[in-house]
């Protein structure tokens, strides 16, 4: 965390990194605050129209799903409804391949 490519919408305990194309990836850990991640999701959706959320491990996936639900509430106040499309993604961390859950979030 502390990467120089993070946006203002990055939640404490989460890291936003540029992805392919225009989609940003928010990396969520089990220690991430779901409300802070939700604010980051809502901000990026408003600004760019879509965001991917990546989580590894049950606790991180739980926080990411809660954040998506909370972000939906924030965005509904602005008349924006979202959909969450889950998928698996293989990532390499410290030389070891891990499977992450990736949530692609976009307007409905």
Predicted region positions:
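Short beta->alpha linker loops
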Residues: 32, 56-59
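C-terminal edge-of-domain segments
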Residues: 76-108
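N-terminal acidic, proline/glycine-rich, low-complexity intrinsically disordered segments
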Residues: 1-13
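Conserved mixed alpha/beta catalytic, RNA-binding, or beta-rich assembly cores of soluble enzyme
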Residues: 22-50, 64-68, 72
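N-terminal intrinsically disordered, low-complexity tails
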Residues: 11-23
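Short, hydrophobic/π-rich interface segment
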Residues: 58-84
């Amino acid at each position: 965390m502390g990467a120089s490519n993070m946006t203002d919408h990055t939640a404490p305990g989460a890291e936003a990194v540029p992805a392919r194309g225009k989609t940003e990836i928010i990396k969520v850990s089990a220690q991430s605050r779901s409300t802070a991640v939700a604010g980051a999701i809502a901000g990026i959706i408003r600004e760019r129209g879509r965001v991917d959320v990546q989580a590894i491990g049950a606790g991180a996936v739980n926080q990411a799903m809660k954040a998506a639900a909370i972000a939906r509430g924030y965005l509904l106040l602005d008349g924006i409804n979202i959909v969450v499309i889950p998928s698996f993604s293989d990532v390499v961390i410290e030389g070891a391949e891990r499977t992450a859950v990736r949530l692609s979030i976009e307007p409905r």
